[in-house]
Design a protein with these regions (language model features):
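Charged low-complexity interaction tracts in eukaryotic proteins
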Residues: 3-26, 76-122
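Charge-enriched amphipathic alpha-helical scaffolds
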Residues: 60-85
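Short acidic DE-rich linear segments
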Residues: 126-127
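Membrane-helix boundary/juxtamembrane interface motif
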Residues: 45, 49-51, 61, 69, ...
Length: 127
């Protein structure tokens, strides 16, 4: 799991996708939620060309608000993720991460974000 020190360093080194706004970070666990979601996705050689509201999908999975800035930092910190939000090198066939990834992330599931039914956003579930 990412440490607070790693996340703070990531915040300093991130080139944020929303240039016109100040980065918004409510809690370092939001970065951890985004990181775990990105980590579960199949990686591709190039960035996707299809724009998706990834932050909303991540929020529903993690049960908590996650800002675009949090996703930007998570992508910066992940050694296998490249690109700029929402165009990362992840498969368009999304994988629903296992909820076990959020064990120890105290802010997960603390807000009323819920996943949509079925596999609407996902092609497969992580085991």
């Amino acid at each position: 799991m990412l440490s607070d020190a790693e996340i703070e360093e990531g915040k300093r080194n991130t080139s944020y996708s929303l240039k016109q706004e100040e980065p918004l970070h409510e809690h370092n666990d939001c970065v951890r939620i985004a990181y775990e979601w990105l980590d579960a996705q199949a990686k591709t050689k190039g960035v996707t060309r299809k724009a998706r509201a990834l932050k909303h999908i991540i929020e529903q999975w993690g049960g908590r608000y996650v800002s675009t800035s949090d996703v930007d930092v998570a992508a910066t910190l992940h050694p296998d993720i490249h690109g700029t939000y929402p165009f990362f090198n992840i498969s368009s066939r999304l994988t629903r991460p296992n909820k076990r990834r959020l064990n120890g992330v105290t802010q997960a599931f603390t807000q009323s974000y819920v996943e949509s039914d079925g596999l609407a956003d996902y092609k497969t579930d992580e085991t």
